[in-house]
């Protein structure tokens, strides 16, 4: 005899044996997909209104369905809704309770749709909302970088390649570089949003439906500018989730790189920056410690987001057409990535607002390590010496300085001219870090005029631009 609980399952008609309890627990997703309730209800209300409009159900039934769904949403939001361990997923939990509340009319809600297109809709509605929120968090972080750049417009520090001192740069230039990365991240997310913002509902299980549904009407109700074109692709497509996870991975990579610099710069060996006590922790045994745990955790959580991307891609790579239950496993990586990215963007914006830079130490380090050696080579080029020859001359001068324990600016004119007779007294101006920075006036360079122009364009909304700009 058929188990009574099996009769309550919407798909239980052809089954003669009850579902094994282990299978019930193993296949249930209600513990994590319940966060989709708002979007499931929003989609169901739009679907019910379409069914009424198309005269597939009557107005009285449609009204009861819509009001019942609104009551369920209120109960979930107030915490009075009871999820059952037997609920497979958020769709079944809501439908079962709707039928309990309004009777047979509730059983008509699923007319003309499948959980396959229903869940695709829920995820798209969810991700559409979350991308908008992430973009707002990115806007705040970009604003924090901009304000800090304006504040540090004259601060000079050593720029690094291979983590070795390379050339002096403005701190503002460095900070705007991170903002530039976030601009690209924002562009990718907005592009991803376009592919998320497509209505899947109406694809049904995989082949569409024979019922006279109106997908365009549902799209208008849910503010989707586009409707999916192939029902088989629609129910199997999770490209948009993978694309979001990839865009999120790049966001996290950029945040991680910045945090790596902060971790190094806040060490006693660098002493370039002090992170506020509010964003650091101490040691349980070493009283002197002030650890950059927030920055370290952002760096660590980046690997977590990468893992979510790889998990989804691995999940998708072997799926036959069309829908497969494997796709249930797309949600936890997605939800975790959304939560992680939002948390990291939010806390990093607050942390950088409260950082203090050691300007004196930065300049002191910029003046060492032969950071103006390239300026000397370019000086020789301006004197008519081919660059490769100039490069060799300066390399020998640097070796001589290391041997003599001097900086380039400390060499006498006699010492300079021993290596190259065209060098004269005007070389000393070229070797100051201030003049070095000032001379980097090519478009996008670190000269103050270029950096301030970039700030101006950002503030006036004219950045970035594809127009060719005259270099000043």
UniProtKB/Swiss-Prot annotation:
Which pathway does the protein contribute to?
Answer: Amino-acid biosynthesis; L-arginine biosynthesis; L-arginine from L-ornithine and carbamoyl phosphate: step 3/3
Q: Which InterPro entries does this one have?
A: Arg_succ_lyase_C, Argininosuccinate_lyase, Fumarase/histidase_N, Fumarate_lyase_CS, Fumarate_lyase_fam, Fumarate_lyase_N, L-Aspartase-like
- Keywords on record: Amino-acid biosynthesis, Arginine biosynthesis, Cytoplasm, Lyase
Instruction: Name where it's found.
Output: Cytoplasm
Instruction: Give one GO molecular function term.
Output: argininosuccinate lyase activity
Cite the CDD domains for this sequence: Argininosuccinate_lyase (cd01359)
| EC number, UniProt record | 4.3.2.1
**SUPFAM superfamilies listed in its UniProt record:** L-aspartase-like
- A GO BP annotation: L-arginine biosynthetic process
Where is the major localization of this protein?
cytoplasm
Top-rank taxon, per record: Bacteria
GO cellular component annotations, sorted alphabetically? cytosol
EC class, as a word, reads lyase
Write out the catalysed reaction. 2-(N(omega)-L-arginino)succinate = fumarate + L-arginine
Which family does the record assign?
A: Belongs to the lyase 1 family. Argininosuccinate lyase subfamily.
- Quote the HAMAP family the UniProt record gives: Arg_succ_lyase (MF_00006)
The identity of this protein, by name, is Argininosuccinate lyase
